[in-house]
């Protein structure tokens, strides 16, 4: 919104807030790494290898949080290229360093952790360098009194709070989905549901792109008070989201066996049985893109408009409905209750 209004002073303040909060949160996690780590290791009965990995990998956490803040700021500035370049660089460095340390240096899983740390901090360094190259003239001098001013700071934390609560609901739904699948009488049901959920994940990645576009452009046009462009942008984002949904429905109808086969080891003794069992529930995967086209885009619109409370409340209601539908119908229709609950959860969002 500040970008749309041409208020680069507030853009600078937002960047400073994001970096300051990321650094403070990262330092807090590093400070508490021992009690947090020991509690988690005790709860999961972690091995020495897990302990070594954790105490190495934890040093990448501040960099990861910083990258979230920097990438969010770039998206708000209508620049998706720098986050993409950063993500590609992080992945290349991560793979290269992990392979080098784990196999060439014979460091095992700790080597992979070192690869993660180096990759994340490389991403931060690249992001900061690109920030200085491309935004040096637009970034104003930081006035820390404005940065810590309570009114914009409250709004900043309110949006972050609502996004975190939304994310916790999503994690609860997906975690419960996996747990409920594992508790079913048929042990193959966990494999089938996981495979089918991967097909939904492919669709969600595509629609996430329109959600990010809606988020950035909604903020821009609201800040510029350009209602006509805002309406046009929202119509196009929704239209393309629906087009992607229809394309995926066609893809799932015509090639669901081939898509499921990608995730099934062909030589596995029960491969044919898993594919056949997946076919009994493929109708839900065909229905979900139609029910789930709008939630991603509407989340982007609400975040861009800073109406995150609406997004949070809709998530609370749909999550409650998800659990109510599952527990109300599981005794009658079994695994179909889980998929019906998930489909209606997406639709209600």
For each of these PLM feature ranges, what is it?
Residues 1, 60-64, 154-221, 241-249, ...:
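Transmembrane helix-bundle signature of multi-pass secondary active exporters and lipid flippases
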Residues 1-31, 67-83, 192-253, 292-306, ...:
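Small-residue-rich hydrophobic transmembrane alpha-helices
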Residues 17, 26, 30, 90-92, ...:
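Residue-level recognition of pore/gate-forming positions within transmembrane alpha-helices
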Residues 28-51, 55, 247-279:
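Short membrane-interface helical motifs at transmembrane helix boundaries
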Residues 46-70, 195, 199-201, 269-298:
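Alpha-helical transmembrane segments of multi-pass membrane proteins
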Residues 91-125, 258, 319-349:
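Membrane-interface helix-loop junctions in multi-pass transport and translocation proteins
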Residues 116, 127-170:
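Interhelical loop/hinge segments that connect adjacent transmembrane helices in multipass membrane
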């Amino acid at each position: 919104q500040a970008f749309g209004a041409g208020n680069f002073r507030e853009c600078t303040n937002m960047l400073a807030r994001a970096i300051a909060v990321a650094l403070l949160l990262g330092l807090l996690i590093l400070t508490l790494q021992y009690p947090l780590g020991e509690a988690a290791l005790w709860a999961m009965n972690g091995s020495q290898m897990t302990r070594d990995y954790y105490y190495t990998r934890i040093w990448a956490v501040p960099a990861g949080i910083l990258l979230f803040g920097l990438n969010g700021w770039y998206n708000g500035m209508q620049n998706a290229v720098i986050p993409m370049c950063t993500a590609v660089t992080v992945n290349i460095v991560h793979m290269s360093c992990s392979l080098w340390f784990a196999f060439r240096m014979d460091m095992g899983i700790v080597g992979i952790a070192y690869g993660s740390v180096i990759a994340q901090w490389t991403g931060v360094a690249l992001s900061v360098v690109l920030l200085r190259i491309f935004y040096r003239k637009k970034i104003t001098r930081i006035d820390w009194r404005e940065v810590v001013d309570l009114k914009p700071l409250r709004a900043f934390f309110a949006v972050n709070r609502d996004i975190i609560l939304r994310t916790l609901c999503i994690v609860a739904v997906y975690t419960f989905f996996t747990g409920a699948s594992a508790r079913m009488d048929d042990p193959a049901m966990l494999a089938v549901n996981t495979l089918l959920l991967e097909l939904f994940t492919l669709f969600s990645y595509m629609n996430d792109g329109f959600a990010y576009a809606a988020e950035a452009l909604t903020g821009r046009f609201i800040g510029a008070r350009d209602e006509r462009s805002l309406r046009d942008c929202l119509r196009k984002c929704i239209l393309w989201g629906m087009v992607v949904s229809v394309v995926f429905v066609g893809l799932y109808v015509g090639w669901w066996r081939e898509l499921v086969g990608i995730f099934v080891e062909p030589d596995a003794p029960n491969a044919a049985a898993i594919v056949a069992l997946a076919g009994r529930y493929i109708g839900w995967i065909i229905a979900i893109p139609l029910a789930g086209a709008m939630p991603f885009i509407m989340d982007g619109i609400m975040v861009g408009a800073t109406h995150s409370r609406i997004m949070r409340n809709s998530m609370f209601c749909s999550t409650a409905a998800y659990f109510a539908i599952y527990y109300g119908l599981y005794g009658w229709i079994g695994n179909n209750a889980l998929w019906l609950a998930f489909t209606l959860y997406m639709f209600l969002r």
